[in-house]
Regions:
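Conserved acetyl-CoA-binding loop-helix of GNAT-fold acetyltransferases
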Residues: 43-57, 74, 78-82
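Conserved functional loop/turn residues at catalytic and ligand-binding sites
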Residues: 37, 53-54, 61, 84
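Short, P/G- and charge-enriched loop/turn segments at secondary-structure junctions
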Residues: 105-113
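Conserved GNAT acetyl-CoA-binding A-motif
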Residues: 57-69
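Acetyl-CoA-dependent GNAT
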Residues: 1-41, 47-51, 117, 125-126
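Conserved beta-strand-loop-alpha-helix junction that forms the acyl-donor binding cleft
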Residues: 67-76, 88, 92-99
Length: 128
């Protein structure tokens, strides 16, 4: 998956400095958040981007936002749950498999010294 091949939303400040970027893909009535990057935490860019992609998804007839993150990404897990996402699935060993077959450069140890092994899927229902 190359996020550059998908629609993107930008968050900018009043002086048009880039604060964040979100890429997404709509498939039927589901919208997947592919990437979300905020230049700085706690400035509202991530929240603004999630709110905007939800509006885009609803306008496109989607009923659900969803995404996948890794087991070490505790900051993302906190953020998404605070935004109404719920844990929907655990994919044990998914990162291990990707490291072995697709991307050997994936590190063994992730954020906060946590072994990087699994993927977690989060979902949020949206109102059409």
């Amino acid at each position: 998956m190359d996020a550059r091949e998908h629609p993107a939303l930008l968050a900018e400040d009043d002086e048009q400095h880039l604060l964040g970027l979100l890429t997404y893909a709509i498939d039927g009535d589901r919208c997947e958040v592919l990437t979300l990057h905020a230049a700085e935490q706690w400035r509202g860019a991530g929240t603004a981007l999630i709110e905007e992609v939800e509006r885009v998804a609803v306008a496109a007839g989607c009923r659900e936002l969803w995404l996948i993150t890794t087991n070490d990404n505790v900051d993302a897990l906190r953020f998404y749950q605070r935004k109404g996402f719920r844990l929907a699935a655990l994919h044990p060993g998914a990162v291990d498999r990707s490291r072995g077959s697709l991307k050997p450069e994936i590190p063994e140890i992730g954020d906060y010294g946590i072994p990087l092994r699994d993927e977690l899927e989060l979902h949020k229902e949206v109102a059409p």
